[in-house]
């Protein structure tokens, strides 16, 4: 609510502190497990559900008219909602975006007639959290709570919650679509992908990667696509940036690829080795798990393929300013791809449970480092 606006700068700290406590608690539990015990254990959902309910209410009802910048585009969404509520019209940005993100704006227009802006943001938070939670639970019921903890501990979780609302909801719905594809419910998976693109057209990329990974699921092809994308990007990356900008399926994405100015700062086009290193972590783990340890199943291959095929497209455009916005279209499933093999396969010959606990801690530690550096 607006009376909490003076406390806006502490909202991220509250999120970080609570997730830190949850992560450290799970770390201390898993770290004590003998060898492969983490694989056979079921994890309690109760604490996670309490956090998710708190997050939906507290952050869904966040101050929306503050200009402090702590909540990204929240103010833009709020002003658009206000125009709909008071005058029944969109602003210019909304009028442009409704052509592609049609479902999001249909829901926004309907909600503007029956609720205030804070309830609408809380509804959008439900649309973000619930599909992700349901997807994690369907993918791996025994370890679903830990999969979700990996998700909420990733650096993009909070950003999708308060800034990239449409994109976050779309990606969350794709996670649920992945889970249904694993269960061979192809019709519902396709419907959910269609719904996801209605929230944000860029969801076409991970949706296409999902269906591609179902039909082209051999690991060697995934690695060939990803490594090939790196080679092509290194060789002719600048030309690819220009080509993708001209051919982009999303006008906003094309603008991002061409934009050289960000918040008053002139940035350079360069190969983002830092982003690539981050993206490679679940891929390196997959290489070791699949090719060295010979451990995988159809669920893991579908998760890995969705991530690697989508990430390969980003690698092709890696030199572009704001290429991280394309990377998010694969990074949203990164935590699940990272956690799934650790919780289901005997990946490490020694101290598997302890190493899994350390990876959980390091995963959230990376989020902490980015926050401190930011």
Name each model-derived stretch:
Residues 41-48, 222, 295-307, 352-360:
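Membrane-interfacial loop-to-transmembrane alpha-helix junctions, especially the N-terminal start
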Residues 70-78, 85, 90, 105, ...:
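Alpha-helical transmembrane segments and terminal signal-anchor/GPI-anchor hydrophobic tails
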Residues 123-139:
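Transmembrane-helix motifs of polytopic, lipid-linked glycan transferases
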Residues 226-227, 347-369:
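Signature aromatic-anchored transmembrane alpha helix within multi-pass, membrane-resident enzymes
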């Amino acid at each position: 609510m607006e009376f909490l606006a003076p406390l806006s700068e502490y909202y991220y700290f509250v999120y970080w502190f609570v997730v830190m406590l949850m992560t450290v608690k799970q770390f201390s539990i898993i770290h004590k497990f003998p060898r492969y015990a983490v694989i056979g254990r079921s994890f309690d959902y109760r604490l996670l559900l309490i956090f998710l309910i708190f997050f939906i209410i507290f952050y869904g009802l966040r101050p929306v008219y503050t200009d402090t910048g702590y909540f990204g585009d929240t103010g833009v969404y709020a002003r658009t909602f206000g125009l709909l509520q008071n005058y029944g019209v969109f602003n210019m940005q909304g009028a442009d975006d409704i052509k592609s993100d049609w479902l999001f704006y249909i829901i926004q227009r309907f909600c503007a007639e029956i609720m205030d802006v804070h309830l609408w943001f809380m509804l959008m938070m439900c649309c973000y959290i619930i599909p992700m939670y349901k997807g994690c639970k369907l993918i791996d019921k025994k370890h679903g709570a830990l999969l979700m903890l990996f998700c909420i501990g990733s650096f993009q979780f909070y950003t999708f919650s308060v800034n990239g609302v449409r994109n976050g909801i779309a990606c969350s719905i794709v996670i649920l679509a992945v889970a249904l594809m694993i269960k061979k419910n192809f019709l519902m998976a396709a419907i959910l992908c269609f719904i996801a693109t209605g929230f944000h057209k860029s969801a076409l990329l991970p949706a296409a990667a999902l269906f591609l990974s179902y039909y082209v699921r051999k690991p060697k092809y995934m690695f060939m696509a990803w490594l090939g994308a790196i080679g092509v990007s290194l060789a002719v990356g600048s030309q690819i940036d220009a080509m993708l900008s001209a051919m982009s399926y999303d006008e906003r994405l094309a603008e991002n690829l061409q934009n050289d100015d960000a918040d008053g700062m002139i940035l350079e086009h360069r190969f983002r080795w830092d982003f690539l290193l981050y993206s490679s972590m679940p891929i390196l783990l997959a290489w070791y798990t699949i090719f060295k340890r010979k451990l995988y199943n159809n669920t893991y291959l579908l998760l890995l393929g969705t991530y690697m095929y989508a990430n390969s497209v980003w690698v092709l455009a890696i030199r572009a300013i704001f290429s991280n916005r394309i990377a998010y279209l694969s990074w949203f499933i990164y935590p699940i791809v990272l956690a799934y093999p650790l919780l289901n396969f005997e990946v490490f010959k020694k101290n598997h449970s302890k190493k899994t606990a350390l990876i959980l801690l390091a995963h959230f530690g990376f989020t902490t480092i980015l926050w401190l550096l930011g």
